[in-house]
């Protein structure tokens, strides 16, 4: 996927390089697991917690997506989070008019690309979520009744 930021086009790809970016994997995993576990959560706390994390989540996700083409193995224009932060800031300024210049939409765009690139499978998130959904209820292992009878001597 290509993102136009400033006067340059950046290629976003979620492949092995992104999966090796701890910040990206941590942010997307926390975000996706949080969204998957909304049941039984205080809605107000969930919304506030999610909203306060959107900027840093978007930054970590963007940084990971830039690694393949613009990191050490690419053109070397994005070598740290500070570089990605400048691009994120510029993207928000550039895209206010088209409606995608906000953290929520940026995350949506990036998650969509992650899905297309198979990123969730690469990092094991798909399998982890599937395992959580197919868990069978635990059965008690102690099926014997306790002998409460007092033995006489």
Sequence positions of predicted segments:
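A contiguous binding-surface segment within folded domains or other stable secondary-structure elements
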Residues: 19-57, 61-63
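Charged interaction scaffolds used for protein-protein
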Residues: 1-9, 27, 34, 38-48, ...
């Amino acid at each position: 996927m290509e993102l136009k930021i400033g006067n340059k086009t950046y290629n976003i790809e979620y492949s092995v390089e992104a999966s090796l970016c701890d910040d990206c994997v941590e942010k997307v995993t926390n975000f996706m697991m949080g969204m998957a576990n909304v049941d039984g959560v205080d809605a107000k706390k969930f919304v506030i917690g999610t909203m306060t994390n959107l900027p840093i989540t978007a930054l970590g996700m963007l940084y990971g997506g830039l690694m393949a083409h613009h990191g050490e193995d690419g053109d070397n224009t994005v070598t740290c989070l500070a570089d990605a932060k400048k691009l994120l800031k510029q993207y928000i300024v550039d895209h206010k008019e088209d409606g995608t210049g906000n953290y929520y939409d940026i995350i949506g765009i990036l998650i969509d690309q992650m899905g297309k690139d198979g990123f969730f499978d690469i990092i094991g998130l798909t399998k982890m979520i599937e395992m959580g959904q197919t868990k069978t209820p635990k059965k008690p292992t102690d099926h014997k009744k306790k002998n409460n009878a007092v033995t006489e001597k």
